[in-house]
Amino acid sequence: VGAEQKLDIAPHLEAIGRPTAEARLVHGRTRDIHSFHLSSSSDERTRHFLKVQDGCDYHCSYCTIPKARGRSRNGSIASLVEEAERIVAAGGREIVLTGVNIGDFGRSTGERFIDLVRALDQIEGLDRLRISSIEPNLLTDELIDYCATSQRVAPHFHIPLQSGSDEVLRLMRRRYDSTLFRQRVEHIRRVLPEAFIGIDVIVGTRGERPEYFEDCYHFLEELDFSQLHVFSYSERSGTSALQIQYTVSPQEKHKRSQRLMRLSEAKLRRYYERHLGRPQEVIWEQGFYEGLMLGHSEYYLRVAQPYDAAAVGTRSRVTPHQLLEGEQGLYLR
């Protein structure tokens, strides 16, 4: 069975266990997946994740998600606002919008992602709305400009680049090139100069020759972002990428990954340093270590202060003056 039928596994097993049961094959097909199951979850009591979309109509050469999750589909704005209001009524302070391809929201309802963001932005009692990973070709100037004017939408963008080489992007069958990606980042910096910009990159894909990786590295070196999320390419059966003959050894993938992670560490440290002495709106989430508690600012910066149980789940404005590093990475205090 596929993801759509996973809740039917128990009934199938029960049927098999009956004395009169006959052997049968149950086979789910992704083209039969049409419904959207609204869901939300929480990693702690202040931040909640609201799934607004599922599935994907893109067919990147290295990816199996469309086969596993089916076509792009979503809940209605009205149903998602209702769920978000329930989250806030239960004490949620921050909502993160998630999905497989959230920028494609509206395929099944004829609505637009920016209109969903506008509707959620009006919910009384919600402190912060954060957008998770969104494709660069779907991250419109209209959406960026709205984020710049909103008091609730966090100035935090997570954008999958995958490669800074146009040759590799073509082999991946991505729907943009490096020029469009640069334009998106530059527009963010014009209207939200201090925004956090996280970028996904895959290294060692089939077809990533040394010169293409160097193109990617230099593209990122010149780009004003905050942090990289680096992934080493792994083969997926049934993908068209397997038809590309040129492969990268595991050792070379590791070397390339390490170079990008060092670049990311340097960029992230500089980003934290830029915020020293600047006020941060922090939602306090949990205990940290050595008598400290941890929270995230609107810029997705980790901030710590002396632990106070009564402050967990509240928001306060602080001005950090120290950049420190612990087991969990950089944080401000």
What do the PLM-derived regions correspond to, one by one?
Residues 9, 97, 131, 159, ...:
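Residue-level signal for inorganic ion chemistry
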Residues 105-125, 172-175, 235-266:
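Radical SAM enzyme [4Fe-4S]-AdoMet core and its adjacent flexible, acidic
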Residues 42-46, 56-57, 153, 163, ...:
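Short flexible coil/turn linkers enriched for glycine and charged/polar residues
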Residues 1-104, 142, 157, 179-190, ...:
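Proteins enriched for Cys/Gly/acidic motifs involved in redox and nucleic-acid/cofactor modification
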Residues 243-333:
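Terminal RNA-binding accessory module
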Residues 7, 58, 103, 137, ...:
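Glycine-centered loop/turn positions within well-structured domains
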Residues 17-19, 113, 147-149, 216, ...:
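Short, hinge-like loop/turn segments at secondary-structure boundaries
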